[in-house]
Amino acid sequence: MELASAHLHKGQVPWVGLLLTASLLTYWSPATTAQVTVEAVPPNVTADNNVLLLVHNLPQTLRVFYWYKGNSGAGHNEIGRFVTSINRSKMGLAHSGRETIYSNGSLFFQSVTKNDEGVYTLYMLDQNFEITPISVRFHVHPSLLPSLSPPTTGQVTVEAVPPNVAEGENVLLLVHNLPRTLRAIYWYRGTTAGERNEIARFITASNKIILGPAHSDREIIYNNGSLFFQGVTKNDEGAYALDMLFQNFDHTLMPVQFNVHAKKQ
C-alpha cells in the first residue's frame, strides 16, 4: 500500500522539516558567552589595598583563559593563564608577583599601586579555539590617612565574594583595610572563637600559617587576612569569623557569611 502524500504549494514547508530544523538548531546552538561578566571588587580602591576581578558564569568548557594588562592580547601584557585540562596556572611577563589567578576565572591583586590602575582583559579560549575577550577597569587613589597613622578597626570590612555561590565554585572572604600592626589573624567556622572551630591562623611576625582542626584542605589564608574556599559544598554554607589579635592582645571578631545553592544542570 502506498503512503498518502500531499502536494506542497509555493512557500509551504513540511512540518516534519520544521521540527527537524528546530531540533537541529536546538542541538547545535552553542552556549553563548553573553552571560559571562567581570566586575572589579571594589572598582575604586586605596593604594596598598586589594582588588578582585571577579568573573561570573565562566563557561566550564573552556580550554584555557588568559588575563592581560590593557586591551591587547600581546604576549608582553600577559599576567597569566589557567589551563583547565591540567588545572594549573602559568604566570606571564606582566606578572608582578602580587597577582593570583583562580580556577573560576577571577584575578586577585594584592597591595595595588597607582601603576596597577587601568583596564584588564580576560580572554577565553573555547573548545572550537574561538577567543572571546571581556574587559574590566579599576581605579587606584592615594590613601587619605597619614603614613604614620595605622588604620582603625572601624575601617576593617569583610565581604563574601560572591555572597551566593553554586556548589563546586569558589568563594573569597575578602578583607579590606586590615591593620598592619596585628600580632595574628584567625579564621573560625561560626561566629565564636573556639579551638575546634579554628580553620587557620596567620602569625605576622614570623609570616607563618598554622592550620586548625576545622581546616578541610580546601581553604587558603592570605597575609592580607582574606580566606579563599575552593570547590565549596553545601556544608560550607554559613557564618565565619575573622579574629584580629592586636599588639596589646585585644581581640576583635568580625563575622561574615555566604550561601551555597545547588548547581544548575
Curated annotation (Swiss-Prot):
Keywords: Glycoprotein, Immunoglobulin domain, Repeat, Secreted, Signal. Glycans are attached at residues 44, 87, 224. Gene3D superfamilies: Immunoglobulins. The record marks 104 as: Not glycosylated. Residues 1-33 form the signal peptide. It holds the Pfam family V-set. Belongs to the immunoglobulin superfamily. CEA family. May interact with other CEACAM proteins on the sperm surface. InterPro entries: CEA_cell_adhesion, Ig-like_dom_sf, Ig-like_fold, Ig_V-set. One of its GO terms (cellular component) is extracellular region. Residues 35-142, 155-262 form the Ig-like V-type domain. It is found in: Secreted, Extracellular space. SUPFAM superfamilies: Immunoglobulin. This is Cell adhesion molecule CEACAM10. Abundant in seminal vesicle and traces in epididymis and prostate (at protein level). Highly expressed in seminal vesicle, minor in colon and placenta and, to a lesser extent, in small intestine, caecum, stomach, salivary gland and bone marrow.
